[in-house]
Design a protein with these regions (language model features):
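Membrane-interface helix-boundary signature
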Residues: 4-11, 242-252
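Membrane-proximal extracellular/periplasmic loop immediately following the first transmembrane helix
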Residues: 31-96, 101-102, 107
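Alpha-helical transmembrane segments of integral membrane proteins
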Residues: 1-54, 249-269
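Intracellular coupling helices
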Residues: 1, 265-283
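"Rare, low-scoring activations can occur
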Residues: 60, 64-77, 144-148, 152, ...
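Hydrophobic secondary-structure segments that place a key small or acidic residue at a functional site
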Residues: 104-184
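Transmembrane alpha-helix boundary/anchor motif
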Residues: 24-31, 233, 262-266
């Protein structure tokens, strides 16, 4: 009947609208994920391998570990930190006050060569030195966001976490996902007596990654054979950090494909029905 035909046409149109909305949503999610993966993080994440050591090995053998790794010509340098940066949405946080302003900041306690190994530029003041690691007074390097937001100055005393001085400022880095905004970040170097179990291994450009990974594995088995170590690169770390977004993209894509298939089946069914209806009218 004419009313039935109108209803069928309306339903097909609704299916097409739903399909188009889902396709647009899938495209938007894909663009968003691509943007997050290609966003400039402020540090050189390529050619960096990360290996977590147990505290005993770090305390006893970290110098041997570095020297043994650097025997491979594909390894440029090795740095250490307490945190695996870039892997989560929050880090050790401290509250402080500067020139009467209260603020929160992430604390990254690291070795003196950490910024250089990670490719983080110092924009004002100086970088950490080996002497800073031996000092009982902490050397602080804050990021640009903290420097500009709090009007920080090189040479100022700072004792929010431990007594020390501001020796410089780095460019902004993004160690959390893009779900949040810019964070105040402080890099700290000093004679804390803490273990820094996360090792950052900078590979030279053009090095044989498989050979380097094999050398790292051999070194770990030699120095700490019972420890179940894992070698990570930032591609893997970001896959974990943005897993929710990846799952959403996959889910929207699947529903979009299902909606398209259902719409095509509906159109095919409508064509078949109309053909049969016309035949009956002619007959």
């Amino acid at each position: 009947s004419p009313s039935g035909r109108k209803l069928r046409t309306t339903l097909i149109c609704v299916q097409f609208v739903v399909s188009i909305v889902l396709i647009i949503g899938a495209c938007f999610v894909q663009i968003q994920n691509s943007y997050m993966r290609n966003f400039s993080l402020g540090f050189d994440k390529d050619q960096v391998a990360i290996v977590e050591l147990n505290e005993t090995m770090y305390n006893k053998h970290h110098d041997t570990y570095v020297n043994r790794l650097k025997e491979n010509p594909g390894i440029e340098d090795v740095a250490f930190a307490m945190e695996k940066v870039g892997s989560k949405d929050g880090y050790n946080t401290n509250g402080g006050s500067y020139k009467g302003k209260d603020f929160q900041y992430f604390i990254i306690i690291a070795s003196s060569n950490f910024l250089r190994v990670m490719g983080i530029p110092v924009i004002e003041g100086r970088d950490f030195s080996k002497a800073d690691e031996l000092s009982d007074h902490v050397s602080y390097i804050f990021n640009r966001t903290a420097m500009e937001g709090l009007d920080m100055q090189v040479g100022d005393a700072f004792d929010s976490y431990s007594s020390g001085h501001l020796i410089g400022f780095s460019d902004d880095v993004k160690f959390t996902s893009l779900r949040g905004g810019e964070d105040n970040i402080a890099f700290l170097v000093g004679n804390f007596g803490y273990s820094l179990p996360i090792s950052y291994i900078r590979l030279k450009a053009g090095s044989d990654i498989h050979a380097v990974v094999g050398h790292i594995q051999e070194t770990m088995r030699e120095l700490d054979p019972s420890y179940p170590f894992n070698i990570e690169f930032y591609d893997e770390i970001f896959n974990h950090l943005y897993r929710k977004e990846e799952n959403l993209r996959d889910l929207v894509t699947v529903f979009s494909l299902l909606a398209i298939i259902i719409s095509l089946v509906g159109v095919f069914g409508l064509v078949v029905f109309e053909t049969q209806y016309r035949r009956k009218e002619i007959g």
